[in-house]
Curated annotation (Swiss-Prot):
Coiled coil: none annotated. NCBIfam families: PRK09547.1. GO terms for cellular component: plasma membrane. The chain crosses the membrane at residues 13-33, 67-87, 90-110, 138-158, 205-225, 245-265, 302-333, 350-370, 449-469, 477-497. Its main location: membrane. It comes from the Bacteria. It comes from Alcanivorax borkumensis (strain ATCC 700651 / DSM 11573 / NCIMB 13689 / SK2). The lineage of its organism: Bacteria, Pseudomonadati, Pseudomonadota, Gammaproteobacteria, Oceanospirillales. This is Na(+)/H(+) antiporter NhaB. Keywords: Antiport, Cell inner membrane, Cell membrane, Ion transport, Membrane, Sodium, Sodium transport, Transmembrane, Transmembrane helix, Transport. It catalyses: 2 Na(+)(in) + 3 H(+)(out) = 2 Na(+)(out) + 3 H(+)(in). Belongs to the NhaB Na(+)/H(+) (TC 2.A.34) antiporter family. It is found in: Cell inner membrane. Na(+)/H(+) antiporter that extrudes sodium in exchange for external protons. Pfam families: NhaB (PF06450).
Length: 530
């Protein structure tokens, strides 16, 4: 009986994760206290950081909250940091937490409008190149004001819906009949080649849209969680953030669109497949049927969602309130005027963001270890000892490499904290801090499209129910992202090295942005325990 119970405990630990992964995490937890006792807290801190990055890289085996959280709890228990320092880090980044909790939930209630829009794009454009550019541009524009995860979720929902409709018809059923679109055994031979082509078509659209979320997400204060985190540290508001990033982000955006068009023209890296004409006909027939079924209540809800979306853009652009509170107003407006008043219907909106919000708190625990043990001090000192014109590109590359294998929010949190400490110690001046903050933000956002580990939206796509249906594996995603990674990363690096500083000086001279003081930074505490 006891042996059976023991096996049950082992099986329950980290659930469906592979046995080797479970043993690895247990080994980490056993080794860390021994290393702290024998080799000291600094070595243990570096080991913990490597272990935490491992949990992020293995996110497909097990969501990083549990293994990363166990490591963070142990770090506090063995004295690598304290609960007070962790709380200090969380409080200092409360606006980021509110963004994740309220803004993502708010956009959930605008999904019908977004679905309607993407459906119209998909059916209204016949040219695959134009369609790909529109999907990429629409995802970029939406991600500049909304949350990249939510935009990706909408694109997934649209593509899943269309895949399910065609798969149902290809299996000899009508729109109204129930059907398992994960089972290919019922697909008629006549439709098999069209189904293969349709899968390829959807894969390419999904990747264009996912990259679009990264292209737009880097541009504005709310596009990615780390943007707000960095803006809070620097004291930048919506307009200033956009202008400071523009010397890098706008050229990257243009080159991203050029890459999108080139990939569709050339048909390389798995792109170029058009939607089969038979499939398009079925989709159009289905859309017309849905339009006929739309009630006045449904249409009124779309109008309310559109008005709420306009308020969202105005609220963010004018900095009417902190980003998270603007998100809360979106929830209240969108639900009040569309009749969503039951608690369980509201609760569903928060499911998407809360796991990542919890994971972000674990990030801050690891950042607290880095701060207390001063792990990155030698790295930062080395980069700051370089010639001034080399510092920005050096930070861009360091962030880019780490963000390709780890989570970019975590990487940004670590580096902006360390550069902030350097400013408070008078090792750099405030203008240099602002330039380095731009390099850190773009370095964590742009090269991170290389793998699903870096971009939360990519990981979300890879782990969705749609990915296996359209045969989108980890390896295929990396290959399809490769041309984007190369073009966008090199463009960002060149702009950081050559254009960022003179463009920023031009913005200062013309009064578009203002010089900040060191005291502006100190409003968001950076020194652990103070």
């Amino acid at each position: 009986m006891s042996a059976t119970l023991g096996r049950a405990f082992v099986q329950n630990f980290l659930g469906q994760a592979p046995a080797w992964y479970k043993y690895t995490i247990v080994a980490f937890l056993l080794i860390n206290p021994l290393v702290a006792l024998t080799l000291g807290p600094v070595t243990a801190g570096w080991l913990l950081l490597a272990e935490f990055i491992f949990t992020l890289a293995m996110a497909l085996k097990c969501y990083p909250l549990q293994p990363g959280g166990l490591l963070a709890i142990e770090a506090v228990m063995i004295g690598l940091t304290s609960a007070e320092t962790v709380l200090h880090k969380v409080v200092g980044n409360i606006e980021v937490m509110l963004l994740l909790i309220f803004m993502v939930a708010g956009i959930y209630f605008l999904k019908d409008l977004l679905l309607f829009m993407f459906t119209r794009i998909l059916l209204g454009v016949k040219s695959k190149v134009t369609l790909s550019l529109l999907f990429c541009a629409a995802a970029a524009l939406l991600s500049a004001f909304l949350d990249a995860l939510t935009v990706t979720a909408v694109v997934i929902a649209v593509c899943t819906g269309f895949y399910g409709i065609y798969h149902k018809v290809a299996s000899g059923k009508t729109f109204q009949q129930k059907h398992d679109h994960g089972d290919d055994t019922t697909v008629e031979e006549l439709h098999r080649e069209d189904l293969r082509r349709f899968r390829s078509f959807l894969r390419s659209l999904l990747m264009h849209a996912a990259v679009g979320t990264a292209l737009g997400g880097v541009c504005t204060l709310v596009g990615e969680p780390q943007n707000l985190l960095i803006a809070n540290k620097a004291g930048w508001e919506f307009g200033e953030f956009f202008l400071r990033m523009a010397p890098i982000t706008l050229p990257v955006l243009v080159m991203g669109f050029f890459t999108c068009a080139f990939l569709e023209f050339s048909g390389s890296f798995g792109y170029g497949e058009d939607i089969p004409e038979k499939v398009r006909g079925i989709m159009r027939q289905y859309a017309l049927e849905q339009d006929r079924k739309r009630t006045p209540q449904n249409r009124a809800a779309l109008v309310i969602q559109a008005i709420t979306a306009v308020w969202l853009v105005i609220g963010l652009a004018t900095h009417a309130a902190s980003v998270g509170l603007v998100g809360l107003t979106v929830i209240i407006l969108a639900t009040s005027f569309t009749g969503i008043i039951e608690e369980h219907r509201l609760g569903a909106a928060f499911e998407e963001a809360l796991p990542f919000t919890a994971l972000l708190t674990v990030f801050f625990a690891v950042v607290a270890v880095i701060a207390d043990q001063q792990l990155f001090a030698p790295v930062i000192e080395y980069v700051l000892s370089l010639e001034k014109q080399v510092q920005g590109p050096a930070f861009y590359m360091a962030n880019g490499i780490l963000s390709a294998v780890s989570d970019n929010v975590f990487v940004a949190t670590v580096y902006v904290d360390e550069v902030g400490q350097a400013l408070l110690k008078n090792e750099i001046d405030r203008d240099t801090f602002d330039l380095l903050a731009v390099a850190i933000n773009t370095g964590t956002n742009i090269p991170s499209v290389a793998t699903p580990n870096g971009q939360a939206a990519f990981l979300f796509l890879l782990t969705s129910a749609l990915a296996p249906l359209v045969r989108l594996s980890y390896g295929r995603m990396v290959i399809m992202a490769l041309p984007y990674t190369i073009v966008m990363s090199i463009t960002g690096l060149v702009m950081t090295a050559t254009v960022l500083e003179p463009a920023t000086d031009y913005l200062y001279e013309n009064g578009w942005i203002q010089h900040h003081q060191v005291e502006d930074l100190q409003e968001t505490p950076l020194i652990p325990g103070h």
